[in-house]
Design a protein with these regions (language model features):
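Extracellular glycan-modifying ectodomains
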Residues: 1-155
Length: 155
């Protein structure tokens, strides 16, 4: 992983994102909004441990109470390596479960489902990051299993 310093263009992009989200919040006062920032390998220089603070910058722009904001923090390469796929920018089963518990807490939800086991599918896939390496690398698709899952309704 090669760290790239934060640029002015990225700051402009972040500010535009914040303005768009605030416009949506203002346009729909009948809805409750929540924001959850996911730190990833582009948010921290793993050599020095220095963060770009995009998470704090982004969330501080939003017209939301602090109780409606959350951050999935990555503080070291070890944490990143444990929680994200090697070949992709998405969480693996460990990271997605940690985020699920965290988001549930931010939303004021109930008790989280607890995994009953780990399922190793044996299936391999090459994520978006592997394109940079001519697809020489792959990850195994591994997920938690649960006894039951609740039914959800979405708008």
């Amino acid at each position: 992983i090669v760290y790239q310093p934060w640029t002015y263009l990225q700051t402009e992009w972040l500010e535009a994102k914040g303005e768009n989200l605030n416009a949506a919040i203002a346009a729909h006062p009948e809805l409750e909004f929540y924001a959850y920032y996911i730190e990833k390998d582009t948010d921290i220089d793993f050599t020095t441990g220095q963060k770009i603070d995009a998470s704090e910058s982004m969330l501080s722009m939003l017209n939301l109470p602090d109780s409606h904001k959350g951050i999935y923090e990555i503080n070291s390469f070890e944490e990143f390596n444990e929680r994200f796929y090697n070949t992709d920018h998405h969480w693996n089963y460990i990271g997605s479960y940690e985020a699920y518990r965290d988001v549930l807490s931010v939303l004021g939800g109930g008790e989280p489902l607890e995994p009953t086991g780990v399922y190793h599918s044996g299936l391999r896939f090459s994520g978006a990051k592997s394109k940079q390496f001519s697809r020489f690398f792959s990850d195994e698709m591994t997920i938690y299993s649960f006894a039951s899952t609740p039914r959800w309704e979405y708008m």
